[in-house]
Amino acid sequence: MQSCESSGDSADDPLSRGLRRRGQPRVVVIGAGLAGLAAAKALLEQGFTDVTVLEASSHIGGRVQSVKLGHATFELGATWIHGSHGNPIYHLAEANGLLEETTDGERSVGRISLYSKNGVACYLTNHGRRIPKDVVEEFSDLYNEVYNLTQEFFRHDKPVNAESQNSVGVFTREEVRNRIRNDPDDPEATKRLKLAMIQQYLKVESCESSSHSMDEVSLSAFGEWTEIPGAHHIIPSGFMRVVELLAEGIPAHVIQLGKPVRCIHWDQASARPRGPEIEPRGEGDHNHDTGEGGQGGEEPRGGRWDEDEQWSVVVECEDCELIPADHVIVTVSLGVLKRQYTSFFRPGLPTEKVAAIHRLGIGTTDKIFLEFEEPFWGPECNSLQFVWEDEAESHTLTYPPELWYRKICGFDVLYPPERYGHVLSGWICGEEALVMEKCDDEAVAEICTEMLRQFTGNPNIPKPRRILRSAWGSNPYFRGSYSYTQVGSSGADVEKLAKPLPYTESSKTAPMQVLFSGEATHRKYYSTTHGALLSGQREAARLIEMYRDLFQQGT
């Protein structure tokens, strides 16, 4: 897009007046994750020249975090490309040679599934026993049948019996238990094992949905999340390579690192003719959750505008710089919005959007990597899954803080060892993950080693030589891993979260001042990397289309 001229002299709205003076709209993107980079790149490719990306942390990538240890790359954040057919992340990775060559058989398997017979997942009890393979397969088939039923409530508009039953966890637990108890062929001992396995599978589901518990995931909305067909893939060189490819077309000066935002002052033009409508702040009014750059009661300092200029939005940064803009694309996580929405936007958000932020869910899923000198597991083993026999009748997935380790569902074996060494990757989610994040490495390594000894029945397992783990819940720039539709929410809330501000159209009010993207704003693909990327492109497309309609290209 070249510099723009109004298509009619009568246009006197704020955007038209600004463009007559400047020729280009100014867009500020908050966040340099997949959504933010995708939005910035799309705008730049369409000729927008006044684009700035503000990233709070010291690096781009957001919830993509690839860590190099020795010759191997480990993913603390996004790990898999979920599906291939029409997945923009997959096509970007494939076009740039980032994917491994796989056989047809490997393509059909995709990533290791804990719910299938592919590979050898070792299900172990806290008494040091391995659950027989036939019992695991029977339970897996049963669980999959019930899992498919959970999809039908949304897809076939099936009514939920009661609001208290509008929970994936409650429905699944009760349905699977009833089928196990009513099976005339299983002896009581086998039934007890299968009943205990329910909780383990629900822990895995909770990790995959990034909820504290599947009891908190809406049954009526669960089936709206859409899986892209095709195999799941990892990127051996690291998921950050996708981020780097996105950033390649973005000039270095566009992205500012270490630049946390304190507040977005929007609807400025309709409130006063010029200058930022920013009230002085005291200590009590300062938002303390936006990182270390906070300046307390320090007065904001002037930003990048002429005093005679008029801007709809002013972005106030933690270093007190004020950046005026025509449009701001907000890509911060739902966790950050939940924690900071009251102080992050002035004026405050509309009631409808606040309600959507409250209703939608986001939790923490963390990984624990343990590296050993030698493997203590067999070459055929692809994972060690932990089944607590005393949880056969349990109705909760919440544990006291001192028992946080019970939420670890198991450890996957990273393959091949030639690439990773002898490494196990553990999974934990929810409030228990937050407790784990507060522990030091030594304590977590010790507890995990004791669990491995207990469940394998091998007291001689040594402590790992190295531990690496994520901490998404306590990171002030994320406050969680990814979103889900919580009980009481629906896809309509995702749409409300994504709706640009202001809601009303007026000749005195500039449109699309604040736009929202990020995985939590994609109705079908929330929680995924492709959902994040597509949401960034979606918001860029809104602006591209608006300026295409409002203005003709200049020469």
Swiss-Prot record:
Basic and acidic residues bias spans: 274-291
Coiled coil: none
Catalytic activity: spermine + O2 + H2O = 3-aminopropanal + spermidine + H2O2
Annotated cofactor note: Binds 1 FAD per subunit.
Location of region: Disordered: 271-306
BP GO terms, sorted: polyamine biosynthetic process; polyamine catabolic process; spermine catabolic process; xenobiotic metabolic process
Pathway per the UniProt entry: Amine and polyamine degradation; spermine degradation
pH dependence, record text: Optimum pH is 9.5 with spermine as substrate.
GO MF term (any one): polyamine oxidase activity
Induction: By antitumor polyamine analogs.
Tissue: Widely expressed. Expressed in human tumor cell lines. Isoform 4 is only found in an embryonal kidney cell line.
Keyword Chaperone attributed: no
GO CC aspect terms: cytoplasm; cytosol; intracellular membrane-bounded organelle; nuclear membrane; nucleoplasm; nucleus
Transmembrane segments: none
Class in the EC hierarchy, top level: oxidoreductase
Pfam families assigned to the protein according to its UniProt record, in alphabetical order: Amino_oxidase
Annotated EC: 1.5.3.16
Keywords recorded for this protein, A-Z: Cytoplasm, FAD, Flavoprotein, Nucleus, Oxidoreductase
Modes of activity regulation: Inhibited at more than 90% by SL-11144, SL-11150 and SL-11158, at concentrations less than 1 uM.
Function: Flavoenzyme which catalyzes the oxidation of spermine to spermidine. Can also use N(1)-acetylspermine and spermidine as substrates, with different affinity depending on the isoform (isozyme) and on the experimental conditions. Plays an important role in the regulation of polyamine intracellular concentration and has the potential to act as a determinant of cellular sensitivity to the antitumor polyamine analogs. May contribute to beta-alanine production via aldehyde dehydrogenase conversion of 3-amino-propanal.
Similarity field: Belongs to the flavin monoamine oxidase family.
Name of this chain's protein: Spermine oxidase
Natural source organism: Homo sapiens
